[in-house]
Amino acid sequence: LEFLLRDAPPFDAIPTLAELAAGCAPGTPARPSALRHAGAAARIALIDELVERCRDLAAMDFEFLYDNACGLLSIGYDVGERRRDPSCYDLLASEARLASFLLIAQGQVPQKHWFALGRLLTGHGGALSLISWSGSMFEYLMPCLIMPSYDNTLLDLSCKAAVSRQIEYGRQRVVPWGISESSYNATDMHQVYQYRAFGVPGLGFKRGLGDDLVIAPYASALALTVMPREACRNLQTLADK
């Protein structure tokens, strides 16, 4: 919210839909009808402002990140050097597939880009899944928040297999499951917590995935889109601890 709106109110000061309907903010008495109407008008104006800012953000141009030679999106752009980064997102099992999906839909990159994304498979427990770079829940499941999913497709089966492997690995390590990119218990010289990708061995190319063990609760929240019952149980386990 702070990214979209200057001077955003504290999260606990944002009224719920029920409170808006009653015409009162948290912890305050109901207001007269005229004030409720004025508040509703102000809320609609704020929503309109957010809509316009979202449209401006959605209009961003990504074409300069597309590498025609390999049919992939660069991981970034070096402003100082005025050139694309030579590395590219080259795996379908990546959070970057959401950008690929949207850019193809917008016509910013050709459809062949989708088929240039790597589809190497890995197996565990009799199930096959796409292999990702770091074996994190984020890579498999973040796009599911927006992208459509269809039963028994490669992506659908891969997401389910990835969650199953995460659950299995949690049992092996005797901890709640859910490993992904996250902050962890290390700080820099400014006492800022560090952030990097963590994952599960067997799901990712990256070496040393079993060296660290960091559980990210949001990984279970992402899994609600795939295995809601198991994810709810795991979230409750995390809350109890």
Summary of predicted features, one role per range:
Residues 1-241:
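Ser/Thr/Asn(+Pro)-rich, low-complexity disordered segments
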